[in-house]
Structures are given as C-alpha cells and as structure tokens.
Amino acid sequence: AVPKLNSLPTASATIYLDFDGHMVTSSLWNGGMPIACAASGMTDAQITEVFNRVSEDFRPFNVNITTDSTKFLSAPLTQRIRVIVTPTSSWKTGVGGISYIGSFTWGDDTPAFVFCDRLGPNNPKFVAECCSHEGGHTVGLSHQSRYDEACNLTETYNTGTGTGETSWAPIMGN
C-alpha cells in the first residue's frame, strides 16, 4: 500500500498524488475513452521522496499535498486535483506529464497525469518536478519563458540550466 502522507492536513485545497493506479473516465482525456492507469511501481521510499519534494514546492501556499485518497475525496470539489503518477503513457506521446490549465477548480475530477515511465524511469526528482509542474498548470499557471537583455522573448519554455542534482529549472511561470 502507498504510505499515507499529508503536508498540511487542515488545508481545504488538496493536491492528491495518486500512485496506486486509477480508472479515468473523464471525457476530456483520450478522446473520451477510459484510461486504465497502472500503479506507478515506485517504492515507498521513492513515493516519500516525491511527496517531500512536491510538498516543499507548495509549502508557501495553503494546500495539502497528500497521498491519501480519503483526504482528496473529503476536499471540496472545486479545491482539489488528482495527479496520477503512472507508467500508462502510450495514449499521450512525447510528454512527461499533461494537465489542463485551471482544472483545479472545475469540480469534475478531471485529473492531471505524470508519466513516471518517461521520467528516469521512476526517478523521484524528475517525477516530483513533473507533479509540481502539472499541479501548477491545474491552478492556472503557464510556463516560464526566457527573455534576452532587451526583453525580447527568446524561448516560450524555459528548460533551465545545469545537470544532475544541482540543475535548476523553473517549475512554472506567470
């Protein structure tokens, strides 16, 4: 079983990191066809590391990062999002994750996806960054762009700098 972790259990807003598989029936994904998302296959230690990293990213905000489905289900419909961490990615090629901008408040349980098979596979740092990134989209954030010294747009998606554990990239923009 996935360890039950909560960063701020008293917050009404909730981001649920779902590692144990989920059947998605939302008509907004996969052309309306159901998606049987497999469990992530990540270890308890990897899940805990992902949770800790995502919790740190969202610490300034009044939002509970959780791996506990009961906390997600008890949160108000318009203040929650499920981020499914899954290797079930063949239906959406070329990305490490995907979500709808602003879907956090839609109230219809449209989830976000993080494709752990494409992130390492199952590298906790990469999975956590993607969870925070897709979670950021769901609350309305866009990508951070790059500009030159004259304030001209040079890239619409800032990929960051460096490699390995000391690398840096923005989670989101806006």
Feature annotation, model-predicted:
Residues 9-15, 20-149, 169:
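Active-site-proximal segment of zinc-dependent metalloprotease catalytic domains
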Residues 119-126, 155, 159-163:
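Alpha-helix capping and helix-loop boundary segments enriched in small/acidic/polar residues
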Residues 1-16, 158-161:
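Short amphipathic alpha-helices and their capping/turn segments at secondary-structure boundaries
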Residues 1-4, 66-70, 152-158:
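Short alpha-helical segments and helix-capping/turn motifs at coil-helix boundaries
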Residues 158-174:
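Post-HExxH zinc-binding segment in Zn-dependent metallohydrolases
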